[in-house]
Amino acid sequence: MIVIGTTPGRENWLNDCLSSLNRPCLVLSDFSYELGKINWCKKHVNKPFFFFQDSVVFKSTDWIDELFDRKKSVALTNDPSFYGMYMGIYDPIILNMVEIPKVENKAEAIKYEIEWTNKYVNYAIDVDIAFPELRDSRASGKEVRHGRECLVLENEYLIKYKGNWGQKPAID
């Protein structure tokens, strides 16, 4: 299962993502940040799922099946740590071992991007990294998209338009 996390008011981002995906997916749209959506999946999804943010544009999608075929947890990238940007394949069995905090603001979401994902990885033990080259330090540049300056992370499979990369304090 593919899960796309979004927030009301980000329909342009979601449309770009969905039109490039061309696959069935579950869209979760609320104000709970990434961990709120992952927590929803923990409670309602009983099989591994691939979590993506709405700011991803897919160039191809066959690689998604290849990663699911590994039958294990797979982090999309490891920058700034495993499951950077929270994206990757999560196993509900592992999720049931890890408490998921309620995130109140963007600063907390960024903090837990390292703290919580490290806890998940510790329980999962053997986590693959799909695209270690997707790193802020290897960004292809910056681009204004839908009124927001983004750091552009890109490889042959996808483009991620990253809104926060340490350029300013995260304020909601």
Predicted regions and their residues:
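ER/Golgi luminal nucleotide-sugar-dependent glycosyltransferases, focusing on the catalytic module
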Residues: M1-D172
